[in-house]
Curated annotation (Swiss-Prot):
UniProt keyword annotation of Glycoprotein present: yes
Residues spanning the membrane: none
Keywords from the UniProt entry: Glycoprotein, Signal
Species of origin: Aspergillus niger (strain ATCC 1015 / CBS 113.46 / FGSC A1144 / LSHB Ac4 / NCTC 3858a / NRRL 328 / USDA 3528.7)
Entry protein name: Aurasperone B biosynthesis cluster protein A
Family assignment from sequence similarity: Belongs to the bfoA family.
Residues bearing attached sugar chains per UniProt: N29, N34, N64, N83, N132, N183, N218, N288
Superkingdom of this protein's organism: Eukaryota
Task performed by this protein: Part of the gene cluster that mediates the biosynthesis of aurasperone B, a dimeric gamma-naphthopyrone. The first step in the biosynthesis of aurasperone B is the production of gamma-naphthopyrone precursor YWA1 by the non-reducing polyketide synthase albA, via condensation of one acetyl-CoA starter unit with 6 malonyl-CoA units.
Signal peptide start-end: 1-26
Length: 305
């Protein structure tokens, strides 16, 4: 596989960039900051610089990343919504920060912004992120992520909306790579992936979900539920009652067992549940600020009540 990237950045400058951004950016017009396009580009690239491994480890260890406001709102199409800086720090940075742990896509190692337009305090971009899928023989996979990001006057992300483009194709590619590595069929690879993810989740449960946080009676009950009672999940079901959803949340259990253990348990907590129809997901009222710029936002059905 040959992948070419036109934009490269150096992690050594990341911390310094974070420190000076709030001081020089974000001239406010009294309602929302009015950045130049160049300033918004710098804010955009600063986020992606910190998204890459190992810079994301430093962000994760901060607990509450300074890249987010305390009440940040985030939505990811294949999963769900995420509220607050601590939760977003865990999911945005912690989810992809351990190359030695079993995961679907591994760790992000490079990126190229291929589309970008910005105005005021909002930028819309398409970013192709290269992940090292360490659980699939260090397979390098390009993942396309479309984002809308809004910043406050201090250069912190106050809300974002992210879409993983062609994610179903990505899942099929990973399964095919696994099938090739085991010299088996895609059905056999899917079964192998199911067993691998379930075994990892149950090991995490046994280690961290103890006492009041225990979700399964024992390891066998955990494996039986994850491999038999729920489906692996489709590409849009990483926020529903599936194994793939629990794979996402398994990475977070170590940081806050009381919060995240229910997400990998039989109930799914508030995240791995089938509580939305298609229409309810599409029409969900969520964001505090409208993404519409320059014209009245009357009729914006995504604005929260």
């Amino acid at each position: 596989m040959s992948i070419f990237f036109s934009i490269r950045f150096w992690p050594a400058a990341i911390s310094a960039a974070i420190l000076w951004l709030p001081q020089v950016l974000g001239r406010s017009n009294g309602t929302a900051p009015n950045y130049t396009v160049e300033e918004l580009w710098k804010l955009e690239t600063t986020f992606w610089d910190n998204f890459l491994y190992p810079a994301n480890v430093e962000q994760m260890e901060a607990i509450n990343s300074t890249l987010f406001t305390q009440d940040v709102q985030g939505r990811v199409d294949i999963t769900r919504v995420f509220n607050g800086s601590e939760l977003n720090t865990e999911y945005i940075f912690g989810l992809f920060s351990d190359p030695d742990h079993v995961s679907l896509v591994g760790v992000p190692v490079d990126y190229s912004i291929t589309q970008f337009i910005a105005q005021g305090n909002i930028a819309s971009a398409t970013t192709v992120v290269t992940f090292n899928a360490t659980s699939f023989g260090n397979l390098l996979v390009p993942v396309t992520i479309d984002t809308w990001i809004m910043w406050d006057a201090d250069g912190r992300i106050m809300q974002y909306d992210a879409t993983f483009r062609w994610f179903g194709f990505l899942l099929d590619t990973l399964v095919e790579a696994l099938a090739e590595s085991i010299n088996g069929t895609t059905s056999q690879a899917t079964a192998s992936l199911t067993q691998l993810l379930a075994t990892t989740i149950c090991a995490t449960h046994d280690q961290y979900c103890t006492g009041a946080n225990q979700q399964y009676d024992n390891n066998t009950a955990c494996l039986d539920f994850l491999t038999s009672a729920i489906p692996l999940g489709k590409d849009y079901e990483l926020g529903r009652n599936t194994l793939l959803c629990r794979e996402v949340h398994e990475h977070m259990v170590q940081y806050d067992p009381a919060l995240h253990c229910p997400h990998i348990g039989p109930t799914g907590g508030d995240y791995c549940v089938d509580d939305q129809t298609y229409a309810q997901k599409v029409l969900q009222k969520y964001f505090n600020q409208s993404w519409i710029v320059g014209v009245p936002s009357t009729g914006d059905i995504w604005l929260g009540d």
